[in-house]
């Protein structure tokens, strides 16, 4: 699996993810890019789970963003509706974090669209470790990027399905 984290602090929203792709007990690739910009560069998306499934969902989200430009929440809800009701999509095994300048959302395969509190959230095999680390660092003077990187490093030290090859994307937030 993998670990993806997002941190919103100090005028920035940062998303970071590791690069490990595992097949069972084997590391197949160490430098996959699971965090990327979509929606004309206005949205950051990160995924955990089956890679092909995640790409399918990213493509669907991009289409929803074209349909509802500048409305990340609406696009995410419409994607979640499709994900939950479509016979093919319902079987996809992936989760996504998405963020734009004003909102961060976690989109699950159950059709949930969740807006995290406390300025941070994480998904994937090391998500709970990264989330706990980020929560502990939110009250420090560290920047959003420093928190995201350190939280992922801690998760990678603990979770065998997360590595230290970290990719970071960031956006300036409204404020």
UniProtKB/Swiss-Prot annotation:
Matching CDD domains: protease_HslV
Transmembrane segments: none
Gene3D superfamilies tied to this protein: Glutamine Phosphoribosylpyrophosphate, subunit 1, domain 1
Reaction(s) the record says it catalyses: ATP-dependent cleavage of peptide bonds with broad specificity
GO molecular function: metal ion binding; threonine-type endopeptidase activity
Entry annotation: catalytic residues: 2
Activity regulation behaviour: Allosterically activated by HslU binding.
HAMAP family according to UniProt: HslV
Family statement drawn from the similarity comment of this UniProt entry: Belongs to the peptidase T1B family. HslV subfamily.
UniProt-recorded name of the protein: ATP-dependent protease subunit HslV
Protein's gene: hslV
